[in-house]
Amino acid sequence: MMRSDKQFQLASLQNNLLQEFMEACRQYKQRLFLGCGFVDEKTPRNSCAIISPDGTYYNRHDKTKVVPWITENWAHPGEKFEVWNLEGINTGVMVCADAYFAEHGEKIAEQGAEFAVVVAAWPPGGHGGPPEEAWKRLSRSANGIPVLICNQTGTEGMDCSHAQSAVLCNGEVLFTYEGREAVLIIDFDEVKKLVLSTEFVTINLTDI
């Protein structure tokens, strides 16, 4: 979520902005997909940085479809989609509007994707119609693989108070979450590559 009390900065491998996230991943032995502004070789990107469970930086996806709005016109578009083997699951990653285009699902399917993670700031309605229709299209075009949408909430920067996080499979929405900032947990069979949950397990951040 955007923080009005924090100055906007771009992460890089040369500064320490990712350090606290890397330390948390190491401490809890969890992988993190972190939506953030990122700068590499003096080129700013709207990215999803991937941090490994041992606390090291792994890789990143740079958003390919940069919209010409004030919220994003600072970023240069990425050029490619990659699929990484993460804990035995071939995983594709996208940022927000990347998920709108069926051909992007086809690109990760061609590379053997079994799961997709999308970090987003995508309120309901707006440009391009309901976001869930784009997410369904993405899942279908990627051979029906499970898609996890991690969406922004809150009202800072823009109104995402009704934005939904979601899990999809075979081109259909399985379940969603809408509300305050929370930790959302699902049960996933990493061998059969199946979503076992029928709803999110929700932990409100105020309860932590």
Role assignments for model-derived ranges:
Residues M1-A11, V118-A120:
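Short, conserved active-site loops that position catalytic residues or coordinate cofactors/metal ions
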Residues L10-Q14, D40:
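Short secondary-structure transition/capping motifs
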Residues L34-V39:
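Short beta-strand-to-loop element that shapes/binds the nucleotide-sugar donor at the catalytic cleft/hinge
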Residues H61, W84, C150, Y177, ...:
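Hydrophobic residues at beta-strand termini and immediately following loops
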Residues L184-E190:
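Exposed aromatic-hydrophobic patches
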Residues L13-F33, Y100-V183:
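CN hydrolase (nitrilase-like) catalytic-core segments centered on the catalytic cysteine
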Residues D40-Q111, P124-R137, S161, E190-I208:
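Active-site catalytic loop in hydrolytic enzyme cores
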